[in-house]
Amino acid sequence: MGNFGRVPVGIVGASGYGGVQLVRLLMDHPEIELVYLGGESSVGKSFASLYPHLAHAVKLSIEEVDPEVIARRCEVVFLSMPNGLACQIVPTLLEKGCKVLDLSADYRFRNLTTYTTWYGVERSDRTTADTAIYGLPELYRDRISEAQLVGCPGSYPTASLLALSPLLKQGLIVPETAIVDAKSGTSGGGREAKTYLLLAEADNSLAPYSVVRHRHTPEIEQICSDLAGHEVTVQFTPHLVPIVRGILATVYATLRDPGLVGDDLTTIYTAFYRNSPWVKVCESGIYPQTKWAAGSNLCYIGVEVDPRTGRVIGMSVIDNLIKGQAGQAIQCLNIMMGWDETLGLPKMGFYP
């Protein structure tokens, strides 16, 4: 244990947007002591030199990534690394007794062939991958509570699945008709310089990207199939919008019972998420906005029915860096440790 009985925690990949969100949130967590920050490109630099606005709170420097050293100093390790790297060190961390929460895609898939097909990385850690639990607490809370390794969901899948789950779990829709139309802010592309994320490129523009080939597609389909009880194919199209943080996922599907109305669905969603403190279902006729969730771990959901088409429209908003990334990982840790699910996480968004 760390000072004052707190749990010693490390972060590998601390210099990216996901990493800095983890640092910021963990520094305020009452049960955590942040003792290690690791990375590659920033080794030897103080964290304060990378993020001067946190200099008053974080006195650590970026260290080399050595799983043996990490395991000696940390009881819990968050991995915020590019896809294909976490799987190189996770087996050692688990062997040494660490609890691991991976924010990359490496441990989200039950079928590693699917992972390799979409991410292009061959894997030799199938035994380890078989022990991973998908880290969406609203669906898999009980499994997460007993996990040693959690594969934290992507931001698009988080927003999309929270909107779709009540419909699929209750058998209310024809699963094969599900369409997800999602918009994300630029921070979802990471901190590394990319032409399409330049202000001159992204501002005053809205653009679809990775149409029919976005890597989050099979992740969404995997969980939809789990909920439906059979293999499901989903049409998913992401868009980049000129905001910094936030995701809006709008889902469409054909209802099995065309007699259902919006009030019915609102009641069903509210009941489905009654034990989920981070999901807020809007009153009938109210639709969520990304600004509501910004800076918080909340997901706001609105739902409507179009009687002309017999389709349901579900709308879900999250902060892609918090509920879609770092905050959800900490939510999973709280569950793994037996703490209150809301501990150390922001409950109110920035507004305006």
Curated annotation (Swiss-Prot):
EC number, UniProt record: 1.2.1.38
GO CC annotation terms, alphabetical: cytoplasm
BP term (GO), one: L-arginine biosynthetic process
GO molecular function, a single term: NAD binding
InterPro entries in the record: AGPR_type-1, NAD(P)-bd_dom_sf, NAGSA_dehydrogenase, Semialdehyde_DH_NAD-bd
Tagged with keyword Transmembrane: no
Record keyword Transmembrane helix present: no
Pfam families listed in its UniProt record: Semialdhyde_dh, Semialdhyde_dhC_1
Catalytic activity, as annotated: N-acetyl-L-glutamate 5-semialdehyde + phosphate + NADP(+) = N-acetyl-L-glutamyl 5-phosphate + NADPH + H(+)
Location of the protein in the cell: Cytoplasm
SMART domains linked to this entry: Semialdhyde_dh (SM00859)
Keywords: Amino-acid biosynthesis, Arginine biosynthesis, Cytoplasm, NADP, Oxidoreductase
The protein's annotated pathway: Amino-acid biosynthesis; L-arginine biosynthesis; N(2)-acetyl-L-ornithine from L-glutamate: step 3/4
Role of this protein: Catalyzes the NADPH-dependent reduction of N-acetyl-5-glutamyl phosphate to yield N-acetyl-L-glutamate 5-semialdehyde.
Family: Belongs to the NAGSA dehydrogenase family. Type 1 subfamily.
Record protein name field: N-acetyl-gamma-glutamyl-phosphate reductase
